[in-house]
Design a protein with these regions (language model features):
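Noncatalytic alpha-helical scaffold of FAD-dependent oxidoreductases
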Residues: 2-178
């Protein structure tokens, strides 16, 4: 069993990261379980889902047969991409024994910012920023409490070149104030 945290550490040591952003469920979470669950974190809109980055899988089906789908490289164009079906299958199609995943170089810079504002303003800002050339990587809205349900917190992660992240962070500060 290969743990998700071990994979993240191994990739970080090489200046790389997964091409998608899976949630972290603790030290016992496995890479096969991560793919089988098919869950995506707040960067799904920009980074894509797990299934978008599965290149190939080996699995053990219910008849104890080892099956191989896909490959180890991006160029895999023959027939159905069955390996993508494994993402989110929760193990119903078989137990994943090996998986090939797309990885990317780590971004040179990232910044996570949070601001308190109304839900309407948060949606307007995200819509505006999404239509601009800003390095918006992830966002999360956390609803206010029962006393102020229309107020909440908008978390935004900028990721990319150092200058782009700095400019986007400053842009966010200005836009939130207006």
């Amino acid at each position: 069993l290969f743990r998700s945290q071990s994979l993240a550490s191994l990739l970080a040591g090489q200046g790389q990261c997964l091409a998608f952003e899976p949630p972290h469920f603790g030290s016992e979470a496995t890479v096969g379980g991560m793919v089988a669950a098919g869950l995506a974190g707040p960067a799904r809109a920009s980074a894509g889902a797990v299934r978008d980055h599965v290149l190939g899988v080996k699995l053990l089906n219910g008849l104890a047969q080892e099956l191989t789908f896909g490959g180890q490289v991006m160029k895999n164009v023959a027939g159905y991409d069955v390996s993508r079906f494994m993402a989110g299958s929760m193990g119903c199609l078989g137990v994943i024994t090996e998986v090939s995943l797309k990885v990317l170089p780590q971004a040179p810079s990232q910044a996570t910012m949070v601001c308190s504002l109304s839900q309407e303003k948060a949606l307007n800002l995200l819509h505006r920023w999404g239509g601009q050339a800003l390095p918006l990587h992830a966002s999360l809205w956390v609803q206010g409490d029962a006393a102020t349900p229309q107020q909440g917190h908008l978390w935004v992660r900028w990721q990319g070149a150092v200058a782009a992240v700095q400019a986007a962070s400053e842009r966010m500060r200005v836009d939130v104030k207006t």
